[in-house]
């Protein structure tokens, strides 16, 4: 009887531990973080706007909503670890879920937010900032693995190429 109770307790402990391990390693999706994004970081879109965009993309529909300024905003890309929203003609936001080097084994993630400003392809400017998954801004860019660094640099390069194309068109 005593042995049965010990086996039962041990088995219960193992099951609870396995369940907690699975929960800790559950994949965080950028759509979940976008849904939880504080209004103060993107005041032109309400929480309902963000939810609608995610739902529209999941349904294969055009993810366009009327924003708080009376204009149109559209989510143009959504994957498990990245999304892009054309907030207005002058602002596009790209969110990337990246892994800092010191968190590779733990699986902790950081949000990279790239705001690209400009209406003319030849005059685009990007500002990059980093946030914890609780949306607390980080003071500096964390050291990232090569793959994530290349993803961010590719977006920066895209801005430079658009700038170059705009200059060439004008001549």
Spell out what each predicted region is:
Residues 121-130:
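Structural motif
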Residues 134-142:
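Short loop/turn segments immediately following beta-strands, especially the blade-tip
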Residues 27-102:
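Terminal domain-start segments
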Residues 107-108, 125:
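A structure-centric signal for secondary-structure junctions around beta-strands
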Residues 141-171:
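Short aromatic loop motif centered on NTY/YTY
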Residues 96-106, 165-171:
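Structural signature of eukaryotic scaffold interfaces centered on beta-propeller domains
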Residues 109-118:
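Short beta-strand elements that form the blades of beta-propeller/WD-repeat-like
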Residues 1-30:
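Bacterial Sec-dependent N-terminal signal peptides
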